Amino acid sequence: MSGFEFHPTTRVIFGESCIDQVGAIAKELGSTRTLLVTDPGIVKAGYCERVKNSLHKQALEVLEYAEVVENPTDLQVQKAAEFARSNSPIDLIIGLGGGSPMDVAKGTNFLLTNGGRMEDYRGFNKATKPM
């Protein structure tokens, strides 16, 4: 299968070795200090190190939160947000892995930009600040 790029409202890049582009993309977005949200399996597989290397090649600082568990709860998101706050400022969040790291990364973004708890955002149009 050949690689491709798809640009709806969210940019999706697919293809062999595209993980190595993460640093250049983060720099293009203006990041200087990135939070990488992932799980122990992704770390063990070596993907986290590849992303960190790509970010470091662009002289970007990386903070790693690799404690995501399968089917994360609101408490997991709260812990990730607390980690992010204790290491602020952060100007980019990357969710690396499957659905669980992605969900925790998105939830962390909600809490960092809008405050409160995850339960505050059940429903529609609850987040009032841009993320």
Indicate residue ranges for each PLM-predicted region:
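ATP/NTP phosphate-donor binding region
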Residues: 1-92
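Glycine/threonine-rich beta-strand-loop-alpha-helix active-site module
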Residues: 75-131
